[in-house]
Amino acid sequence: MVMEEGRSIEEGLLQLKNKNDDSECRITACVILSTFVAVCGSFSFGVATGYTSGAETGVMKDLDLSIAQFSAFGSFATLGAAIGALFCGNLAMVIGRRGTMWVSDFLCITGWLSIAFAKEVVLLNFGRIISGIGFGLTSYVVPVYIAEITPKHVRGTFTFSNQLLQNAGLAMIYFCGNFITWRTLALLGALPCFIQVIGLFFVPESPRWLAKVGSDKELENSLFRLRGRDADISREASEIQVMTKMVENDSKSSFSDLFQRKYRYTLVVGIGLMLIQQFSGSAAVISYASTIFRKAGFSVAIGTTMLGIFVIPKAMIGLILVDKWGRRPLLMTSAFGMSMTCMLLGVAFTLQKMQLLSELTPILSFICVMMYIATYAIGLGGLPWVIMSEIFPINIKVTAGSIVTLVSFSSSSIVTYAFNFLFEWSTQGTFFIFAGIGGAALLFIWLLVPETKGLSLEEIQVSLIHQPDERNQT
């Protein structure tokens, strides 16, 4: 009986798909404002990501830290984010997307202020962990919120702005870290969180979360604000309600649901993308760019400043192309580019060690780091979060989102902590390992990652639910 009802609901959803509704194509001021407010947290996260690169010298000198202590400090943000990932999904479901961002702001502000006024390593590490927990919440809820409020034809572009603002924060830390103290940098990291706290009072809640909790009147009000007061929101509201009803009838939303046959594929895609994003070396290269430049004999000040200048235009490429080229082409281009640049970095440091053409190592390393960050920014930097926000149905989004976010930050913490030790063990070997993982990432994307460009969230989720059956038939 439930299966028959589920099929009839799916048929109704597919019929709704064939109807045109211009209201879904509108980009209103409310959508733009809501996205801007949401990505303020992403900017602060970007500052935290590059903070160890910009603050390394000052922190180690002022607080007399060893390499091991500073490596631990660097990894504590991702460790905290992994802790936040355990709660992000449930928190976002219980108190909503806006409420979760408020909680994140409180944690991030507390953490940044603790770092800024730290006189000893204990308070420094406390601030890093607490802010990390906040970033764990932000990294999940921001792309989910943006994906749930934006029209489908620009959803990728708007959701990718999450990565753009992370890169903006990264650019600021690379640029300002050359002449601003590490304590002032921490205060700058807290500023976007204060802006978000205020801005959240003026933006609507996610209509899909409102449908999940049964607030149909608030759902309509949210859609009217997002699509315009004169818009016909009936089709979109019906589609959201139909899909919500379908997944609720189909499942009790327990942890075991994740391992149902129809959801395994999406879980493999979500977790796989996060693993290859981190183990291809992104967190290490971004966090310790100054260390790489120093080892290569290239000017740290010039290298980080140039990264700061070019990191935003690089992300803009992905922002422009994500809804034109699609997710898969950008991801494959990104994985290939990251693999090749890591291979060349390994070659550069091999030449340096063998004292063969070692004069090429500084400039080759600089070019490779720049190209690595560029190819990372257009694809694997932001698209795993875009796809994560799209592929999970509302009934498993809580648990699946938490697991995927936990995997991301746990693996990032491992890579960030281990990098300095790997770098001392074998500089060139470290990058050859990253290159090999990048090659495996290319194969994974080609074989498994679906294209979601131009589809509504409901259309994506219906098609992916049937993906295992379609694969068995072929």
Curated annotation (Swiss-Prot):
The keyword Metal-binding does not apply. It is found in: Membrane. GO terms for molecular function: sugar transmembrane transporter activity. Expressed in young seedlings. It comes from the Eukaryota. Induction: Triggered by NAC072/RD26 during senescence. Pfam families: Sugar_tr (PF00083). The keyword RNA-binding does not apply. Gene3D superfamilies: MFS general substrate transporter like domains (1.20.1250.20). GO terms for cellular component: membrane. GO terms for biological process: response to nematode. It is a multi-pass membrane protein. Keywords: Membrane, Sugar transport, Transmembrane, Transmembrane helix, Transport. Its main location: membrane. The chain crosses the membrane at residues 27-47, 76-96, 106-126, 129-149, 159-180, 184-204, 266-286, 302-322, 329-349, 363-383, 403-423, 429-449. Sugar transporter. Belongs to the major facilitator superfamily. Sugar transporter (TC 2.A.1.1) family. This is Sugar transporter ERD6-like 17. It comes from Arabidopsis thaliana. The gene is SFP1.
